[in-house]
Amino acid sequence: MKPSEIREMSIEEIDAKIRELRLQLAKERGMLTMGTSLENPMVIRNLRRDIARLLTIKREKLREMRKK
């Protein structure tokens, strides 16, 4: 996800996307633990980065709201 896409989302939408990505990350890690080879090993890394991006922008939005 691009930061510009995330900034257009509301905080509720960001929270929903974070939950969705965390669930997907748990599934991917579970597959890895069970010994299943992943189609794309970069999936886990990309999921972690997307979650971090979402959390960062969410925090920025919350700070802006508190200042107002």
Curated annotation (Swiss-Prot):
GO biological-process terms attached to the record: translation
Gene3D superfamilies given in the database record: 1.10.287.310
Signal peptide: none
Alphabetical keyword list: Ribonucleoprotein, Ribosomal protein
Disulfide linkage: none
Gene Ontology molecular function: structural constituent of ribosome
GO cellular component: ribonucleoprotein complex; ribosome
A Pfam family hit: Ribosomal_L29
Protein family membership: Belongs to the universal ribosomal protein uL29 family.
Matching NCBIfam families: L29
Name of the protein in its database record: Large ribosomal subunit protein uL29
Organism, scientific name: Pyrococcus abyssi (strain GE5 / Orsay)
